[in-house]
Curated annotation (Swiss-Prot):
Segments for region (Disordered): 321-341
Designated name of the protein: Probable sugar phosphate/phosphate translocator At1g48230
Family from the record: Belongs to the TPT transporter family. TPT (TC 2.A.7.9) subfamily.
Compositional bias per record (Basic and acidic residues), positions renumbered to this chain: 321-330
Cellular component terms (Gene Ontology): endosome; Golgi apparatus; membrane; trans-Golgi network
Major site of localization recorded for this protein: membrane
The organism's place on the tree of life at top rank: Eukaryota
Keywords on record: Membrane, Sugar transport, Transmembrane, Transmembrane helix, Transport
Length: 367
């Protein structure tokens, strides 16, 4: 039994490492592809559509052709009232986020992403899924102050890029809240493959509208570099990232995932300054981000306490692994209740869809 637990723990940390590598890699890869200074494919909507098309195609093969995964019962009413609005905001968050790469550095983007819990909390309060609380509000103020300080210290500050990134953050926050509000009412449970199957094509359609207006008129085929292997590997990495998120969720607890997320952000900031020399980090950048990070950590601590208050008998990781092994749960069943891991670079809806019908707890996480 001890050997089984040790082996499982090793696998858990391997999955965490894979998640950190893939998440950082996809962000850096997208920046490299889109940046005029490098691969020079300044078409963020087109790149996002490639991700959506590839993801939807893979999901179709797995469900309809190879029948590896069974389809879920999806009615027209659920599709229109749930999948369509969620897909719209999901597509918007990816579009805005990828567009930001054209204007601001990866390091500054990661610092701005510290606003994610602020945006999610505000959207949750507006939609009635969370209550305004003084302790959380103070954390949100701390995060906001940190981001403002970090922005003030940004040497290459760009208003357009900053606005796009903030819009992407709020679109993603609204997507998370809508996922909870809409799908929870329907009791719908989707795993990563079935969520790909329904979300990706719908997101592709939504993206085609701004693409037709903003990018199609400016596309000069003779000046565009289209390397099949570059785009294939880019889409494949994005797809692999989502599945790594699913594996991590099934094997770790809330604290571990949050620590991994913070570690990933710091690694990404450091790597981006090495890979993209034009990315300059100032002392004020670091100070502001550290302030914001304190607020994020305190916010996560409060949310973890909320989860433990509702589930006072939560098992430790080894105990939960042993319990899951004894009960022979599937990887989907091993997902910790009330936990949501979100990564804006993943090309589909993440963990909330895999357990939305089994929990009444909305716990929002910034990754």
């Amino acid at each position: 039994m001890a050997k089984m637990i040790n082996k499982t723990l090793v696998l858990t940390y391997i999955y965490l490492l894979i998640y950190i590598i893939l998440s950082s890699g996809v962000i850096l890869y997208n920046k490299w592809v889109l940046s005029p200074k490098y691969f020079n494919f300044p078409l963020p909507i087109t790149l996002t559509m490639i991700h959506m098309g590839f993801s939807g195609f893979v999901a179709f093969l797995l469900i309809r052709v190879f029948k590896v995964v069974s389809p879920v019962k999806m009615t027209f009413e659920i599709y229109v009232t749930c999948v369509v609005p969620i897909s719209a905001f999901f597509a918007s968050s990816l579009w805005f986020g990828n567009t930001a790469y054209l204007h601001i550095s990866v390091a500054f983007i990661q610092m701005l992403k510290a606003l994610m819990p602020v945006a999610t909390f505000l959207m949750a309060v507006v939609c009635g899924t969370d209550k305004a609380r003084c302790d959380v509000f103070m954390n949100m103020v701390l995060v906001s102050v940190g981001v403002v300080v970090s922005s003030y210290g940004e040497i290459n500050f760009n208003v357009i890029g900053t606005v796009y990134q903030v819009m992407g953050i709020f679109a993603e926050a609204l997507r998370l809240v809508l996922t909870q509000v809409l799908l929870q009412k329907k009791g719908l449970t989707l795993n990563p493959v079935t969520s790909l199957y329904y979300i990706a094509p719908c997101s592709f359609v939504f993206l085609s509208l701004p693409w037709y207006v903003l990018e199609k008129p400016n596309i000069d085929v003779s000046q565009i570099q289209f390397n099949f292997w570059i785009f294939f590997s880019n889409a494949l990495c994005a797809l692999a990232l989502n599945f790594s998120i699913f594996l991590v969720i099934g094997r770790t607890g809330a604290v571990t995932i949050r620590v991994a997320g913070v570690l990933k952000d710091w690694i990404l900031i450091a790597l981006s300054t090495v890979i993209f020399p034009e990315s300059t980090i100032t002392g004020l950048n670091i100070t502001g981000y550290a302030i914001a990070l304190c607020g994020v950590v305190m916010y996560n601590y409060i949310k973890i306490k909320d989860v433990k208050a509702i589930q006072p008998t939560t098992d430790s990781l080894p105990d939960r692994i042993t319990k899951d092994w004894k009960e022979k749960n599937s990887s989907d069943g091993g997902s910790p209740r009330g936990l949501e891991l979100n990564d804006e670079e993943a090309p589909l809806i993440t963990s909330r869809l895999s357990h939305i019908g089994r929990t009444q707890l909305g716990n929002h996480t910034a990754v």
